[in-house]
Structure formats: structure tokens, C-alpha cells
Amino acid sequence: MSNKKRSASSSRWLQEHFSDKYVIQAQKKGLRSRAWFKLDEIQQSDKLFKQGMTVVDLGAAPGGWSQYAVTQIGSKGRVIACDLLPMDPIVGVDFLQGDFRDELVLKALLERVGDKKVQVVMCDMAPNMSGTPAVDIPKSMYLVELALDMCRDVLAPGGSFLVKVFQGDGFDEYLREIRSLFTKVKIRKPDASRARSREVYIVATGRKL
């Protein structure tokens, strides 16, 4: 891609981003990101969070989902968050900075979870996008497979899994895998998710024994 085309594409993205009503609302409300609104819509329909829950947030930065989750689980709840990028502190959130794909980071994350199972695992991870689906989709599927592995390790029976997935090769197989592990599975496209984006959110509840 030429610099001219890249510049035009970047300019369009910036214009779209800063005119987005959810970006504007997030700024007015002092929220970390527009992702807050996606999770709020999902919570209204699927009721994932309750007071006192422990939640794992993968791909947490800049903190939109963690920020929302703590409002739902209260002072007795706990969010354990992880991201490759730094994240400013949030009261009620135990944040670990590191690459989730790294064995040492995963070990540290599991140590923070401890022996008790968690009630929700949520994953908003995405790779650095090249704009080429044949490259981006496999990278994304690898990340969400790791997140599902995390569910197998730490999610309590009856627990819930929320994951952002980009539709493409491997999506149907991944969905079948999730359905084998949970009693109820829904696909959501929140209003705050841009229409042209391939992203959808799989909401899986009732982790099977």
C-alpha cells in the first residue's frame, strides 16, 4: 500500500472514530473506551455479572470492560485483567501487564486467580491488524483459542464466557467447540460495534461439568 493510500485510509478512520457517538459519549462520561457500551448492552440482554463475582478480563487495555465489570460485581467482586499494553489503575482490578501467549505470563495470571474458580472469563483480544483477512483471521483465532483454553482451566461450572471473534475461516469450528462446553450460546453484534467490522461477540453461559 502506498503512503498516499495509507494516509487516506488513516484519515478516514480518524474522522469516523472521532465522530462516533459512542466515542463522544465515552469521552463525556470519562470512560476508558467505547467498549464500555458494548459490554453494557450485552449485560442488559444476557446478565453475565452479579455482585461478588470474580472475572478474568483478557485483552483488557485501555480498561473499558474492566471499568464496566467493577460497577456490576461491587466491592466484594474482583477483576483479574491482563494485556500486553499498559493500563492505568482501576479500583477493584488486579492488572497484569504481559503477553498472554507467553507461558510465564500465563503462569502469573493463573497464580493471581488462585485455587478458586471464576464466574466469568471475557476476552476482547485482537492481534495487530494488517487489513488482510487471510493474515489477520488466523492470528485472531489463535488468541481466542487460548482464551477458551483459559476457560477450561479456571471457569466454574455454570460460569460464562464472552469473547470477541472476527468472522472468517475457523469461526464455525470455534463456535461448535464453544457449544460443546456451554449449555447456551448466543452471537451478539452490539450497537456500539461498527457495522463494517467483522467482529461479533459470542456469549456462552452455563459452563458444563
Curated annotation (Swiss-Prot):
Signal peptide: none annotated. Keywords: Cytoplasm, Methyltransferase, rRNA processing, S-adenosyl-L-methionine, Transferase. It catalyses: uridine(2552) in 23S rRNA + S-adenosyl-L-methionine = 2'-O-methyluridine(2552) in 23S rRNA + S-adenosyl-L-homocysteine + H(+). The active site is at K164. The keyword Cytoplasm applies. GO terms for molecular function: rRNA (uridine-2'-O-)-methyltransferase activity. Its main location: cytoplasm. InterPro entries: RNA_methyltr_RlmE (IPR050082), RNA_MeTrfase_FtsJ_dom (IPR002877), rRNA-MeTfrase_E (IPR015507), rRNA_MeTrfase_gammaproteobac (IPR004512), SAM-dependent_MTases_sf (IPR029063). GO terms for biological process: RNA methylation. One of its GO terms (cellular component) is cytoplasm. It comes from the Bacteria. S-adenosyl-L-methionine binds at G63, W65, D83, D99, D124. Its EC number is 2.1.1.166. Belongs to the class I-like SAM-binding methyltransferase superfamily. RNA methyltransferase RlmE family. Specifically methylates the uridine in position 2552 of 23S rRNA at the 2'-O position of the ribose in the fully assembled 50S ribosomal subunit. This is Ribosomal RNA large subunit methyltransferase E. It comes from Yersinia pestis.
